[in-house]
Amino acid sequence: MDIDIDDILAELDRDTTAVASSSGQHGFLDANSSMQHVTQTTAFDSSLPHANNLQKDYSPVTPEQDYLQLLKHWRNERCAPELLPLPKLLVSRMLKRIQDQMEHIENISMGFLEHEILEKDGEEAIGQNEYQNNALNNGKLPLLCMEAELERVKFVMRSYLRCRLNKIDKYSLYLRQLGDQGINLISLDELMSEQELKYHAKHSVILLKLLNNSILRHMPPELQAINDTEGSVSMIEEPNWKKFVFIYVNGPANVADDPQLQQSEDGKYYYNITIPEFDEIVELTTGSIYVMRYDIVKDLLRDGKVELI
């Protein structure tokens, strides 16, 4: 599924307010909710080789689990100084569920007056009005709850994508340098979606044209290099790797699967990290919170062993 940033932001801004609802009290994150037409999915695409064998070892991914994962990626993206890899499958599933829930709410609102408010032959006008008002009041509350819950999910998704776009704008030349030199641990294709790559390419071209037309072409040739890093101040703005961040140590679901995880004498599990400047080893105990420099824990963050808070 292609991830179109423009379509995402436009779709999430669309007004989904409806006037009424049926009597079912279901939410967006409930696996047995009114989204019965949205089946549970797994983290693997069945069209990939050996995907059927992989699916046997993994349980289905519920909407609630996906939402919690989205919250974790959202917090990490907002707290990290660099652009983190995009969880493409997770974002695709969440966008599909958001769209399906929006359509479901609209279907409920359009069919409510037809199916729930029935005119009774022979009733007096006052009694009929009371019946209709009670039906409206009883059916509107569940729909309002569904809409409020959907708006929370849309807010998180919208904030997550805009935070990523802001980092692409801020570190456009740095990301361009990583792509040209290939010095990054992961490729730009894994770091960004297809639409984010197109946005980054167009933004960097516009920025380079602006710098060249306004400043660089009026300077001596030896000073026109936009990627000059030989002076005291680099021409390319990089993320602040020395930034201090709060981390929560998750640890793996199965301690036997992580060779880096060690066990202390009192039975607690921890990770060893080294602070190069002091040649000091620090133990990060699972389930604990620490304040560390980002460059020290970024590898643990990418492996999912810690999360930013």
UniProtKB/Swiss-Prot annotation:
It is found in: Nucleus. Gene3D superfamilies: 1.20.58.1030, 3.40.5.60. Belongs to the GINS4/SLD5 family. The GINS complex plays an essential role in the initiation of DNA replication. Has a role in chromosome segregation. One of its GO terms (cellular component) is nuclear replication fork. The gene is SLD5. Pfam families: Sld5, SLD5_C. Its main location: nucleus. SUPFAM superfamilies: GINS helical bundle-like, PriA/YqbF domain. Coiled coil: none annotated. This is DNA replication complex GINS protein SLD5. Keywords: Chromosome partition, DNA replication, Nucleus. InterPro entries: GINS_A, GINS_bundle-like_dom_sf, GINS_Sld5, SLD5_C, Sld5_GINS_A. Component of the GINS complex which is a heterotetramer of SLD5, PSF1, PSF2 and PSF3. It comes from Candida glabrata (strain ATCC 2001 / BCRC 20586 / JCM 3761 / NBRC 0622 / NRRL Y-65 / CBS 138). GO terms for biological process: chromosome segregation; DNA-templated DNA replication; double-strand break repair via break-induced replication.
